[in-house]
Swiss-Prot record:
GO terms for biological process: DNA recombination; DNA repair. InterPro entries: DNA_Rcmb_RecR (IPR000093), Rcmb_RecR (IPR023627), Rcmb_RecR_Znf (IPR015967), TOPRIM_dom (IPR006171), TOPRIM_RecR (IPR034137). Gene3D superfamilies: 3.40.1360.10, RecR Domain 1. This is Recombination protein RecR. GO terms for molecular function: DNA binding; zinc ion binding. Residues 76-171 form the Toprim domain.
Amino acid sequence: MDISRLISLFSKLPGLGPASSRRIVLHLLRHRHDVMTPLANGIRELEESTKECEICFNLDVTSPCSICTDSRRDKSLLCIVEELGDLWAFEKGRIYQGMYHVLGGVLSALSGVGPEDLNMSSIPERVRLHGVKEVIVATGSDMDGQVTCHYIAQSIKSTGVKVTRLACGIPLGGEIDYLDEGTLRAALSSRYII
């Protein structure tokens, strides 16, 4: 692989443009043995050992994942998040001890993303079969996040389960993954029924 192709591949990562990618590639080339080789091996091992959880769609080394198999977690709470980074934000803050469901995105008419493109079809069954008493919809506050929230609420309405949404602390158009722990804690504690 030539250097320019590797720079182009790094540029596809979030937050990295051509200049940052070039600096990273040059650093890797200068530090082949102590940085590049362990990084390449780590990426290869990660690719081989990571599995998508068959229940919540988290990524882990086992399926079901360590969250879904943890007997200390509150199985009556189900927090639905857009992306894996949102789940990790909750876990990092240690502010939530229930179960998760990772959608893999949000509904978006403009982008052509419908319910069949997301991990949505198993939500009603999870709610019915696993003793869920409250579903917390933790999607972003932008239009697509709100539409997704409404769709989820309608899809489980017949179960009679309480459906809540994160409240204060999340700015309009904000992304959960970028919130600090205090803001996320405030939003979780002041969620409201939808």
